[in-house]
């Protein structure tokens, strides 16, 4: 990678730390999730939730959203300056579900943001603990990635819906910092940049004046983040062109869309972290586990181990399949929405099916849904094996391109081939190789054409038994080479709407 000297591990970004050694990183990540756990326990006490109610993932999500809203400085400021009817800018809340006489009831609660901030800080040794907030944002983002499709958003920015595997983190808020930037997919960054350029085309003052200077700095920073995700010199050179453009316009949009398409084969490096719902950390803290002392990692065995020993429940609508609901949450917990289903199935130990075959809607329940018919069931979040999360796109041997699939962005560092339909992808690259970036485009297309679907990625990497915490005996799975493994085939999920 380019900036080897200054690169921080994504645990460090997650905890806002400078360079630390492995033990310090484990301790600071442990401190972060321990703080989330303590906060959750305190909120359950405040709300008088029973043990069962506290393990309900819908209650966990409401509590997480409340603390995120309480710390959303920009939105809080905006709400105070633009008072809207029926919204108290100083309060936050949401639905809490309680078990009453064998039925589930919804209760809407409202809290002072100041009070929530106080409880959060108290759980985090008096600090703002921004890292913990980002961690919750990434968990929500991973849940959205597994639940919704972004076809409409892709089409609106002129991209192809088949590029959905590049959209990791597309619902992360802007304020999610370095840890958030690390988990954003190539498509997400391209989309943010295209939106920005389009605003500049429509609003001539966008790049001008004092505000314009700040906008420009943000634009160049986003370009650099995206550049850092690409692994080939030609893709990076194209990003330099886009960044240095005096007056970004349609030519830059074209270049960005070209780069996004190229990332289907020349994949970018996108980090993956297992971020769990707050109630899981709460359960562990309540049972006396000391995260800071034991240390914790988001990319190793720890989250798997935590999920082996946690019982989490979910509300289930009348015609939903509890096993499918479990799969959805399992994928979200391991940030595996864009992983090859063959790999996920092997690790989980039960077959993971494409989203088009799931009989389940999202985890959150809308306020107009009838609670009378709601049931609840245990989420099966355990796994057969564990594997190390990756931040590489799985391109084989360093600089060369490897076969990418039209919809996979590997999560686990496990050996596999990446089957892809080269014809489908290459069809998108006919024609336009003229203009300033022609030599780079030609080079990128050449690399893509030389990629072979039978190449093996993550050579020699395997999964591990849950008893093998030091990762000493890798088990390298063998996969059916022909089997296409994308979660998004035959997709009928609902769109993500804010």
Swiss-Prot record:
Q: Which Pfam families match?
A: Flu_NP
Question: Which stretches of sequence are listed as region Disordered?
Answer: 1-21
Q: What is this protein called?
A: Nucleoprotein
Signal peptide (residue range) = none
Q: What does this protein do?
A: Encapsidates the negative strand viral RNA, protecting it from nucleases. The encapsidated genomic RNA is termed the ribonucleoprotein (RNP) and serves as template for transcription and replication. The RNP needs to be localized in the host nucleus to start an infectious cycle, but is too large to diffuse through the nuclear pore complex. NP comprises at least 2 nuclear localization signals that are responsible for the active RNP import into the nucleus through cellular importin alpha/beta pathway.
Q: Assembly state and interactors? A: Homomultimerizes to form the nucleocapsid. May bind host exportin-1/XPO1. Binds to viral genomic RNA. Protein-RNA contacts are mediated by a combination of electrostatic interactions between positively charged residues and the phosphate backbone and planar interactions between aromatic side chains and bases.
Organism annotation = Influenza A virus (strain A/Mallard/Astrakhan/244/1982 H14N6) (Influenza A virus (strain A/Mallard/Gurjev/244/1982 H14N6))
Taxonomy of origin reads: Viruses, Riboviria, Orthornavirae, Negarnaviricota, Polyploviricotina
| Record's keyword annotation contains Protein transport | no
Major localisation: virion
Q: Does the keyword Cell inner membrane apply?
A: no
- Report which gene this protein is encoded by: NP
InterPro entries cross-referenced by the UniProt entry: Flu_NP
Instruction: Locate the motif Unconventional nuclear localization signal.
Output: 1-18
Q: Where is this motif: Bipartite nuclear localization signal?
A: 198-216
**Where in or outside the cell is it found?**
Virion; Host nucleus
Report a single Gene Ontology molecular function.
Answer: structural molecule activity
Per the record, the GO terms for biological process are:
symbiont entry into host cell; viral penetration into host nucleus
The text of the family note is: Belongs to the influenza viruses nucleoprotein family.
């Amino acid at each position: 990678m380019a900036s080897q000297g200054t690169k921080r591990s994504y645990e460090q970004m997650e905890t806002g730390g400078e360079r630390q050694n492995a033990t310090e990183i484990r301790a600071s990540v442990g401190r972060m999730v321990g703080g989330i756990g303590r906060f959750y326990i305190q909120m359950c006490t405040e709300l008088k939730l029973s043990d069962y109610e506290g393990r309900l993932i819908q209650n966990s999500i409401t509590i997480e959203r409340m603390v995120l809203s309480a710390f959303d400085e920009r939105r809080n400021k905006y709400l105070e300056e633009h008072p809207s009817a029926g919204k108290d800018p100083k309060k936050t809340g949401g639905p809490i579900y309680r078990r009453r006489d064998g039925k589930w009831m919804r209760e809407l609660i409202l809290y002072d943001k100041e009070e929530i901030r106080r409880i959060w800080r108290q759980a985090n040794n008096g600090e703002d603990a921004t890292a913990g907030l980002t961690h919750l944002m990434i968990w929500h983002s991973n849940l959205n990635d597994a639940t919704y499709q972004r076809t409409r958003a892709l089409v609106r920015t002129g991209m192809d819906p088949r590029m959905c595997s590049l959209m990791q983190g597309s619902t992360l808020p802007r304020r999610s910092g370095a840890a958030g930037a690390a988990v954003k997919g190539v498509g997400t960054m391209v989309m943010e940049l295209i939106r920005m350029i389009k605003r500049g085309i429509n609003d001539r003052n966008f790049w001008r004046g004092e505000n314009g200077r700040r906008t420009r700095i943000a634009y160049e920073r986003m370009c650099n983040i995206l550049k850092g995700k690409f692994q080939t010199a030609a893709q990076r050179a194209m990003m330099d062109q886009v960044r240095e453009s005096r007056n970004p316009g349609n030519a830059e949009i074209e270049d960005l869309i070209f780069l996004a398409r190229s990332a289907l084969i020349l994949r970018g490096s996108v980090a993956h972290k297992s971020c769990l719902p707050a109630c899981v950390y709460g359960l562990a803290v309540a049972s006396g586990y000391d995260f800071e002392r034991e240390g914790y990692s988001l990319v190793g065995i720890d989250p798997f181990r935590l999920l082996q020993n946690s019982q989490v429940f979910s509300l289930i609508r009348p015609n939903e399949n509890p096993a499918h609901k479990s799969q959805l949450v399992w994928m979200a917990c391991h940030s595996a929405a864009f992983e090859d289903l063959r790999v996920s199935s092997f690790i989980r130990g039960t077959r993971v099916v494409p989203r088009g075959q799931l009989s389940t809607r999202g985890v959150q329940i809308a306020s107009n849904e009838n609670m009378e018919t709601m049931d609840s069931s245990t989420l099966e979040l355990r796994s057969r094996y564990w594997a190390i999360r990756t931040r590489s796109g799985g391109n084989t041997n360093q600089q060369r391109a490897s076969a990418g699939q039209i919809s996979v962005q590997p999560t686990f560092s496990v050996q596999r081939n990446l089957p892809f339909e080269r014809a489908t992808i290459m069809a998108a690259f006919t024609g336009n190789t003229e203009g300033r970036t022609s030599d780079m485009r030609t080079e990128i297309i050449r690399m893509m054409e030389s990629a072979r679907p039978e190449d093996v990625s993550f050579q020699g990497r395997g999964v591990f038994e849950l008893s093998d915490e030091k990762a000493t005996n890798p088990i390298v799975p063998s996969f059916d080479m022909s089997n296409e493994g994308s979660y998004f085939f035959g997709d009928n999920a609902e769109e993500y709407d804010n």
